[in-house]
């Protein structure tokens, strides 16, 4: 039980730190499982999805006032209504692709080699976009054009490949479509709510039989750790990228992916 608690804490930290950074939480969790023997077995694979609820609630807590105002104004405020529609439009491509190909993707692509290559390629793309002399036209994540929301949602679908990063894909697309860095990051947070909630509900439905009393305690520990870590990371991340951009995270991806490939090639 103690070993399981330690695993839950470590994986909760990994989830909370990486979920909203453009570095791929799924990729990092898969690498943690492969190289440190963390999270082997069906329960632990479900655990990695279930503790995402902690990260989702972190966003709801941080943006509660803004999201509550939008919810209240959905039927009276055209801007609030447009934003809600925009989030749904952005979420739709991932919902369709996930339902159609999710099982295939998990079966064939969820392995450390794919993760490492995706980390490196995604890091190179993030570094390239971060250094472009882009002229932002949109500075409010709740006021993008509807077509922009849709294109961001399409880009997010690439993150079904482990190692790509859901937030990274949506941030890169948003910046190329004319948003500034802060609003690109913020919208990736908002888009995470329906996307991750959908994955959470689906996985809970499929694997509820594995949820024994002991397992629920382990999930609860991972959930709390993920929530607290995500709160700290999101607040720090927004301040950092506004001032410094995404270069640090791009290099992080490249270094982790390269070290992972070396370790795999050596049979570690």
Curated annotation (Swiss-Prot):
UniProtKB keywords: Antibiotic resistance, Cell inner membrane, Cell membrane, Cell shape, Cell wall biogenesis/degradation, Hydrolase, Membrane, Peptidoglycan synthesis, Transmembrane, Transmembrane helix
Transmembrane annotation, as ranges: 47-67, 83-103, 109-129, 144-164, 184-204, 217-237, 248-268
Gene Ontology biological process terms, A to Z: cell wall organization; peptidoglycan biosynthetic process; regulation of cell shape; response to antibiotic
GO molecular function (one): undecaprenyl-diphosphatase activity
Domain of life of the native organism: Bacteria
EC number, UniProt record: 3.6.1.27
Keyword Membrane annotated: yes
Keyword Membrane carried by entry: yes
Pfam families: BacA
Record's subcellular location: Cell inner membrane
Role according to the record: Catalyzes the dephosphorylation of undecaprenyl diphosphate (UPP). Confers resistance to bacitracin.
Name of the protein described by the UniProt record: Undecaprenyl-diphosphatase
